[in-house]
Regions:
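Structural signature of outer-membrane beta-barrel domains
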Residues: 11, 57, 72-74, 99-103, ...
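Residue-level signature of outer-membrane beta-barrel architecture
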Residues: 56, 84-87, 126-128, 180-184
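Outer-envelope beta-barrel architecture signal
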Residues: 2, 61-65, 77, 88-92, ...
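Transmembrane beta-barrel architecture of outer-membrane proteins
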Residues: 19, 47-49, 70, 76-78, ...
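Short acidic/polar hinge/loop motifs at secondary-structure boundaries
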Residues: 2, 9-36
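Transmembrane beta-barrel strands of outer-membrane/channel proteins
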Residues: 67-71, 81, 94-100, 138-144
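Short strand-turn segments of transmembrane beta-barrel domains in outer membranes
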Residues: 38-39, 51, 56-85, 115
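Flexible loop and strand-edge segments within Gram-negative outer membrane beta-barrel domains
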Residues: 101-121, 129-186
Length: 186
């Protein structure tokens, strides 16, 4: 019942409840806002327990690029890239992430504690600085994820009639946002 927002938009939709905070690439985050209590209900029925708003970085005068490579002891690998630049009245940000998590059976009971997961995120945003007080931002985020968990023999393609339990989930999310801002007074 916690509403997750990206730059004030409900970008995660009904998937927020099943989304782990570890699945949100941190490279483009400028800050995180948390609203709890009765004030959160202003964001709708999905915000009864609170709101978490992830605020992205905006282009600065100097170019910025960050590459993050991560390998876990639980057989997971991540590669993330963030780049941003402002060129006069135009700016951009680009975030990309690839994740692979091998199926992992921590307690060796024959069932995966972590599913086999492939995921990919690409998120470009364009900033148009029309004048000192007016800005237009257009962005798109596409996320693909393929998960398969359950009986380790089934996941690895060795399942028989007695080994049939598994769960598979393939999801594609595409969110396009546009934000027009006009400052009325300074």
């Amino acid at each position: 019942y916690t509403q997750m927002l990206k730059d004030g938009f409900p970008s995660y939709g009904g998937f927020a409840g099943s989304q782990s905070l570890l699945e949100i690439p941190p490279l483009d985050l400028r800050q995180v806002e948390i609203i709890k209590g009765p004030a959160a209900t202003f964001y709708g029925e999905g915000a009864i327990a609170g709101v978490v708003n992830f605020i992205s970085k905006s282009p600065g005068e100097e170019a910025e690029s960050t590459l993050l490579l991560n390998q876990t002891s639980a057989l997971g690998s991540d590669a993330s890239l963030f780049t941003t630049r402002k060129l006069g009245r135009f700016g951009y940000t680009l975030l990309g992430q690839f994740n692979y998590q091998n199926e992992y059976d921590v307690d060796e009971d024959g069932f995966s504690d972590l599913p086999r997961t492939y995921s990919f995120v690409i998120s470009p945003r364009a900033f148009f600085y029309i004048d000192e007080k007016t800005q237009l931002t257009i962005g798109n985020t596409t996320t693909f994820q393929n998960r398969k968990g359950g009986d380790m023999r089934v996941i690895r393609g060795n399942g028989g009639p007695q080994n049939i339990y598994f769960e598979k989930n393939v999801s594609v999310r595409n969110v396009t946002t546009a934000n027009f801002t006009r400052e009325l007074a300074k």
